[in-house]
Amino acid sequence: MNTNDIWLIAGLGNPETKYDGTRHNAGYAALDYLADKWGISVSKTKFEGLWGQGEVDGHKVVLLKPLTYMNLSGDSIAPLAGFFKIPADHVIVLCDDITQNPGKLRIRPSGSAGGHNGLKSIIARLGGDGFPRIRIGVGAKPRPDYDLADWVLGKFPAEDAKALADRCPDIEATAKLIMDGKLGLAQSKYNG
């Protein structure tokens, strides 16, 4: 293992149990899947989050669930990345995306927040948008006048929850490809 090859994978969400199963917690759900598959306990408390570390296919990996609430996610991610000296391009963010249908993935090497307050916070705290992200489709509001907060904080219907669960293996494969320097391949295989 290359000792400089360390990655931070952060799943975004809100920490209270009342938010379990909500659209905004798609990142938490995906991170829980990775932690289970990779045998990494995400139970240490520091950096305003729950975190754990392990090794995945020769890469040192730190998994993080910020406990700052979505809009302040950067307040957890930036200090942890700084502590472990993880550069921004080795920070993979898992988050919800209301512009994609439930279960669809949008993989990007960098870019704007696209209206996502969690990503805005991370961009501000890391000092730029040069970090990869796996955006997980949770579906658009049912009508334009529907309150966005009510939508993203609403529970997934069973079929949408299944669509997310069905894509978790693809999220895992995408994270591994990104860590292997093959983000373009991940995009061609798993976007959509």
Put a short name on every predicted segment.
Residues 1-110, 120-134, 141-147, 154, ...:
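Nucleotide and nucleotide-moiety/phosphate-recognizing core
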Residues 114-118:
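Hydrophobic alpha-helical segments within soluble ligand-binding/sensing domains
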